[in-house]
Curated annotation (Swiss-Prot):
Its EC number(s): 6.3.4.2
Protein name: CTP synthase
InterPro entries in the cross-refs: Class_I_gatase-like (IPR029062), CTP_synthase (IPR004468), CTP_synthase_N (IPR017456), GATASE (IPR017926), GATase1_CTP_Synthase (IPR033828), P-loop_NTPase (IPR027417)
Organism the protein comes from: Syntrophus aciditrophicus (strain SB)
Glutamine amidotransferase type-1 domain span: 291-533
Protein family per UniProt: Belongs to the CTP synthase family.
Function: Catalyzes the ATP-dependent amination of UTP to CTP with either L-glutamine or ammonia as the source of nitrogen. Regulates intracellular CTP levels through interactions with the four ribonucleotide triphosphates.
CDD domains in alphabetical order: CTPS_N, GATase1_CTP_Synthase
Extra remark beyond the main annotation: CTPSs have evolved a hybrid strategy for distinguishing between UTP and CTP. The overlapping regions of the product feedback inhibitory and substrate sites recognize a common feature in both compounds, the triphosphate moiety. To differentiate isosteric substrate and product pyrimidine rings, an additional pocket far from the expected kinase/ligase catalytic site, specifically recognizes the cytosine and ribose portions of the product inhibitor.
Native organism taxonomy: Bacteria, Pseudomonadati, Thermodesulfobacteriota, Syntrophia, Syntrophales
Keyword check for Translocase: no
Enzyme class: ligase
Active site positions: 380, 506, 508
Gene Ontology MF annotations: ATP binding; CTP synthase activity; glutaminase activity; identical protein binding; metal ion binding
Length: 538
């Protein structure tokens, strides 16, 4: 079957949920038996988001092949079975870098290099190459219609549609239909203007997805269709939901997937959505609940930990349990102490991060978890700080630290990877992507995975310093995961604790609602046991 293309744009304002919409459409189409892939075209000039602040961009999602990408690729992976990679995220920076490199090589044979056709051709070539081997490719255009940065991408997809034909490519426009409480009615004018801006650059949407609080009436749909030059049957409600995994089911009930396959002339059966129905049922009607504290430095923007938050929810699904997340700023703990911030918490998770801000607060929290037998899960920086805390307060190495935060520490229990010492550039220069890990028998990690050889994704420069391995192991630290050559420490645990585990990798990137990651599933299971014990002791 020839590849079909679905281009998804957004209007009126940002953060409408284009990524979630693209992922949900892909999920329903995959449930119809189609091979799907997603692409994200980002209009910023950065080559990738790897060096961008989490407060500006949110999470950096790492793929198996080591790409640092937009967080929407995390949505794509969680909603479909397709693994994302470097070819699934294109930025303006990458486009211009490639075109300028070709110009310097002489590929354009002396021509004047321009946005049209050279930049737009580069974008179109990328779309084609990244879609090979799939039945349907969903391409999300970042930003909002009207942004000057998005114009080359919009022009490229306009040309692309003309080249492949209307039965092989469609445009879906996600827009906002606000409900004005004082007037008691929904307003369609923002949508009208958004579509008008899109049509002015030559793109006529085939389908409108209207983000709103409640389902739109037939009268409102008819009005939108009239002013936006689409048929009434092509106006769909993208209703606000409390559970994002309900979105594929809502889209199917609205008939969106049927409309798409009709427009693209795809013959498929009805989708098998039982797995999604089961996920939603377990999230909305759980038998148990736990409170998990996420202690980090980017908690003021929860998108900074998007995959982490979702992986904890997945762990709850695997235990028929609602997971209540409590975000705790580690920098505030440094200033004010614990101050009841961990009261009634059933598990503590310290996630990854960079820089020394808030690390002493993390160490206080880890000590609390260790001494009070609270289930603890440390990821990347969280694992490193667990090692520092153990070295200081159990092994008596009072000034132990990571050389990232104190170059003059007498005990650098966490140190720079040897291959990183000569690295000068920041972008895409860390230990990135999937690496194998060998687990020790009779460990929490091996018990969770059920195997001794695993592969997980990494994003770090610093590692456990093996010069301190013997000293820390003598005090009760267990190294239960190593690289196959034994050179790098990947997982640590401690003796005499019900569940205390730190890993150097990022397991959250491989968790799905239909396949919860084993470490998150076991962490939530341990939190449930702790909650039950806490209730019995009261």
């Amino acid at each position: 079957m020839r590849t079909k293309y679905i281009f998804i744009t957004g209007g009126v304002l940002s953060s409408l949920g284009k990524g979630l919409a693209a992922a949900s459409i892909a999920a329903v189409l995959e449930c119809r038996g189609l091979r799907v892939t997603n692409q994200k075209l980002d209009p910023y000039i950065n080559v990738d988001p790897g060096t961008m602040s989490p407060f500006q961009h949110g999470e950096v999602f790492v793929t198996d092949d080591g790409a640092e990408t937009d967080l929407d690729l995390g949505h794509y992976e969680r909603f479909t079975s397709t693994r994302m990679g470097k070819s699934n995220n294109l930025t303006t920076g990458q486009v211009y870098f490639s075109v300028i490199t070709k110009e310097r090589r002489g590929d354009y044979l002396g021509k004047t290099v321009q946005v049209i056709p050279h930049i737009t051709n580069e974008i179109k070539d990328y779309i084609r190459q990244s879609s090979e081997g799939f039945d349907v490719a969903l391409i999300e255009i970042g930003g909002t219609v009207g942004d000057i940065e998005s114009l080359p991408f919009l022009e490229a997809i306009r040309q692309f549609r003309n080249e492949v034909g209307k039965q092989n490519a469609i445009f879906i426009h996600l827009t906002w239909v606000p409900f004005i409480k004082t007037a008691g009615e929904v307003k369609t004018k923002p949508t009208q203007h958004s579509v008008k801006a899109l049509r002015e650059i030559g793109i006529q949407p085939d389908i409108l997805l209207c983000r709103t609080e409640e389902f739109l009436s037939e009268d409102i749909k008819a009005k939108i269709a009239l002013f936006c030059n689409v048929e009434e049957a092509a106006v769909f409600t993208a209703k606000d939901v409390s559970c994002i995994y309900e979105v594929p089911l809502i889209y199917h009930r609205e008939g969106l997937d049927q409309k798409i396959v009709d427009l693209l002339n795809i013959w498929t059966g009805q989708p098998h959505l039982e797995a999604w129905e089961n996920v939603v049922q377990k999230i909305t009607s759980p038998s148990y609940e736990v409170n998990i504290a996420i202690v980090g430095k980017y908690v003021n923007l929860t998108d900074s930990y998007k995959s982490l938050n979702e992986a904890l929810v997945h762990g709850g699904i695997g235990n028929d349990c609602q997971v209540n997340l409590r975000f705790v700023d580690s920098e505030k703990i440094e200033k004010d102490g614990l101050n009841h911030q961990l009261e009634n918490v059933d598990g503590i998770l310290v996630p990854g991060g960079f820089g020394n801000r808030g690390i002493e607060g993390m160490i206080q929290v880890i000590r609390y978890a260790r001494e009070n037998k609270v289930p603890f899960f440390g990821i990347c920086l969280g694992m490193q700080m667990a090692v520092v805390e153990f070295a200081r307060h159990v092994c008596g190495l009072e000034k132990a630290n990571s050389s990232e935060f104190d170059e003059n520490t007498p005990h650098p229990v966490i140190d720079l990877l040897p291959e990183q010492k000569a690295v000068q550039e920041m972008g895409a220069s860390m230990r990135l992507g999937s690496y194998p890990c060998r687990l020790s028998d009779a460990s929490l990690a091996c018990e969770a995975y059920g195997e001794v050889e695993i592969g997980e994704r990494h994003r770090h420069r610093y590692e456990f310093n093996r010069d301190y391995q013997e000293r820390l192991e003598a005090c009760g630290l267990r190294i239960t995961g190593r690289s196959p050559d034994g050179r790098l420490v990947e997982i640590v645990e401690i003796k005499d604790h019900p569940w205390f585990l730190g890993c150097q990798f990022h397991p959250e990137f491989k968790s799905r609602p239909t396949e919860p990651h084993p470490l998150f599933q076991r962490f939530i299971e341990a939190a449930l046991r702790y909650r039950k014990k806490r209730a019995e002791d009261q």
